[in-house]
Amino acid sequence: MAAVLIVAAVVGTALAGSGYWTLWQSRNSSSAEPLPASLIAFPERKPLAEFILVDDEKGVFDLKSLESRWSFIFFGFMYCPDICPTTLYDLSLVKREMVALGIRQSDIQFVFISVDPARDKAAQIQRYVQYFDPAFLGATGSIGQLTNLTRQLGAPFRAEPETSTNVYEVTHSSAVYVVDPLGHYAGIISPPFVASDVAAQFAELYRANEGLELALGD
């Protein structure tokens, strides 16, 4: 089984269209290993600060929405012609592989967050993501609300000014961000995604942290 790579203080930034991400390492970067795997798990996890977004199911998607399960967060937009639908499809395969490895569906959730709130509305986003998997979640928010979360995860985005034809470009991260059941930023998955590899790497992380949600009451 592929081992989960652990590196020191990593922040990933991926830009749509180029499909690459840049890795910053801490002063201990000399001890970091090569990068053979898609999933990078952080040795020290940073707790996320409060944020508020909007979803179609409960009306509010916030920090509490990430508690008690592992969350896989992908930022994009519905008008995205390639990276977003491809990544969501890949994540549906990743989920299937995870379940096949014995990971409980109730312990994981996949969240697509639109960074194009001018065109993408919560109800539309939810219908869009459910095309890939009925359990996938969708959310969005104002630019300020989105920035509050994306800055915490190191997931830059930029939308061009709106036009009269409502056609414009949106630049966003192509990575998937992993948050643990305590609401801590736990890792990053960089493309290209090989479903079986990502699932196997996460299975190690998952089993090493089984029962983590119990600490919520501490």
Predicted regions and their residues:
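N-terminal targeting signals for export/organelle localization
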Residues: 1-50, 208, 218
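Thiol-based oxidoreductase modules, predominantly thioredoxin-like and allied folds used
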Residues: 103-120, 135-144
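Thiol-/selenol-based redox modules, centered on thioredoxin-like
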Residues: 162-218
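Short, internal strand/loop/helix patches
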Residues: 126-173
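Short, acidic, Ser/Thr-enriched surface-loop or helix-capping motifs
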Residues: 55-56, 180
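Conserved helix-turn-beta segment immediately C-terminal to the redox Cys motif
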Residues: 88-112
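Short loop/turn microsegments at loop-to-beta-strand junctions
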Residues: 48-49, 70-71, 173-175
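Short active-site neighborhood of thiol/selenol oxidoreductases, capturing the structured segment around
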Residues: 61-91
